[in-house]
Amino acid sequence: MATYLDFEQKIKNIQDEIESSIVKGDSHAKEILERELKKEVERVYSNLSDYQKLQLARHPDRPYAMDYIKLILKDAYEIHGDRHFSDDGAIVAFLGYIEGEKVIVIGEEKGRGTKNKLARNFGMPNPEGYRKALRIAKLAERFEIPLLMLIDTPGAYPGIGAEERGQSEAIAKNLQEFSQLKIPTVSVVIGEGGSGGALAIGVADRLAMMRYSVFSVISPEGCAAILWNDPSKIESATKAMKITPDELKKANLIDDIIEEPEIGAHRDKEGAAKSLVNYFLKSLEEIRGEEHYLQKRFDRLMSYGSFTQSA
């Protein structure tokens, strides 16, 4: 059963009326309602606040990494473990083909249903997850296979065990190693890009965001609690933090924005997957055509945080 957010309620009501008209066999009413639905979708999605975009990024029906992998990857073979401690369920990795192109996909997976969410730790990787990602990225480099990374995490797991096993070191090591991989790499934020948990698989030749995704150094709830000592000020925090694709593109922190279907990825997973595939293949062609893509990757990383100040 589909989940609707508060600002999507009118859309739900119209869709319910369309279904009712189909049952009654009233094709004329159906046509009128479909036109009304199109107008309402355009009205709602063209006037979203930053907080509403955050809600969409966290939408329970939004496609997760495993959903995209099932839709885009052929002959998929899962790769497990970090060869040091364990196999972290929050990080998934598959070898397969995207439209005939051999590729390795690494993703952060939140899971669906109570049992699966617990197994995936709600998409919050432990250090062994990041070490697993690095091991598989080095494997991709060894066999000259391009890498697609799907970011979707509220953040790296902050538990005592994770800290004892070197959470910060694992993230830092990934930043260092991923910046030097001698293969084309593409990272896409598909939902939430939470702080270091996202950065650990976010260093790439291309960093893009799906239209209704977010990327931030801390959750808006955490920001509101720290700045105003009031977690209820989440809407103000979301706006102030500038976590949407448009704001991050304006700041040159991401390369591209991948458009989603008009009704959002949570209503059209196949359409969103098609947009993701098109972007990945286009980016791959561009990167392969660049003479010094490693240097370009380095230069872009070094440009982060730089600014000019006028007198």
Swiss-Prot record:
Q: Name one Pfam family in it.
A: ACCA
Give the subcellular location. Cytoplasm
- Matching InterPro entries, A to Z? Acetyl_CoA_COase_a_su, ClpP/crotonase-like_dom_sf, COA_CT_C
GO CC terms for this protein? acetyl-CoA carboxylase complex
Q: Name one GO molecular function term.
A: ATP binding
| Gene3D superfamilies on file | 2-enoyl-CoA Hydratase, Chain A, domain 1
Does the entry feature the keyword ATP-binding, yes or no?
yes
Q: In which pathway does it act?
A: Lipid metabolism; malonyl-CoA biosynthesis; malonyl-CoA from acetyl-CoA: step 1/1
The CoA carboxyltransferase C-terminal domain sits at 36-286
Biological process terms from the Gene Ontology for this record are:
fatty acid biosynthetic process; malonyl-CoA biosynthetic process
- Please give the chief subcellular localization of this protein: cytoplasm
Q: How does it assemble?
A: Acetyl-CoA carboxylase is a heterohexamer composed of biotin carboxyl carrier protein (AccB), biotin carboxylase (AccC) and two subunits each of ACCase subunit alpha (AccA) and ACCase subunit beta (AccD).
Family matches, as PANTHER family: ACETYL-COENZYME A CARBOXYLASE CARBOXYL TRANSFERASE SUBUNIT ALPHA, ACETYL-COENZYME A CARBOXYLASE CARBOXYL TRANSFERASE SUBUNIT ALPHA, CHLOROPLASTIC
Q: What does this protein do?
A: Component of the acetyl coenzyme A carboxylase (ACC) complex. First, biotin carboxylase catalyzes the carboxylation of biotin on its carrier protein (BCCP) and then the CO(2) group is transferred by the carboxyltransferase to acetyl-CoA to form malonyl-CoA.
Name used for this protein in its record: Acetyl-coenzyme A carboxylase carboxyl transferase subunit alpha
According to its UniProt entry, this protein's organism is Wolinella succinogenes (strain ATCC 29543 / DSM 1740 / CCUG 13145 / JCM 31913 / LMG 7466 / NCTC 11488 / FDC 602W)
